[in-house]
Amino acid sequence: GFGDPYLAFKIGLVGAPALTLAEFMKHKPTFQLYAYGGIYVPIGDYDSDRLLNFGTNRWAYRFGLPMVLPLGDPKRQTNLEIHPGFTFYGDNDDPTGGGGVKEQDELFQVEFHLSTHFNAKWWGSVGGRYRKGGETTTDGAADGNEQDVLGGEVTLGYSFTPHLGLQTTYGDVLTESDGSQSTM
């Protein structure tokens, strides 16, 4: 089956002018701020009798203010990217495992990356993500699963062509107070 489709938009608020290709090639990037919004549409494959589902049987909405701060020499392309945002969830009125209604609190998340190009082919990044909130309740009873976790990652990438590359990432939970465990 298919999962729920996700539709999103991003619009430049500061430092992201509309440019022709020729103007873009000459443009020196400065601080950029965007408005971001997205919606998960609950039309994916879902059956409350199954433990695993591609769909979620609920609407969800994401909003954020991503920003990019170019640092140093534009020829080496070093950027600090910060993407704070919130996700708001609708109710699932037919949750897996029974029960009448599953609700979920809003989830705050901020993701950040410092990336640089070492030369025309090699690039690297360090970053992380903090998540707080998102506890679910089933029929009004708290499920005790609020997220409060900070993860970190390092990435090394190689570009074979401008459109084809390879990257490897290592990530881990740095600190948590919710029992989260993950290594990738």
PLM regions and their residue ranges:
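Outer-membrane pore/translocation modules
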Residues: 1-104
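Outer membrane beta-barrel transmembrane domains
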Residues: 92-184
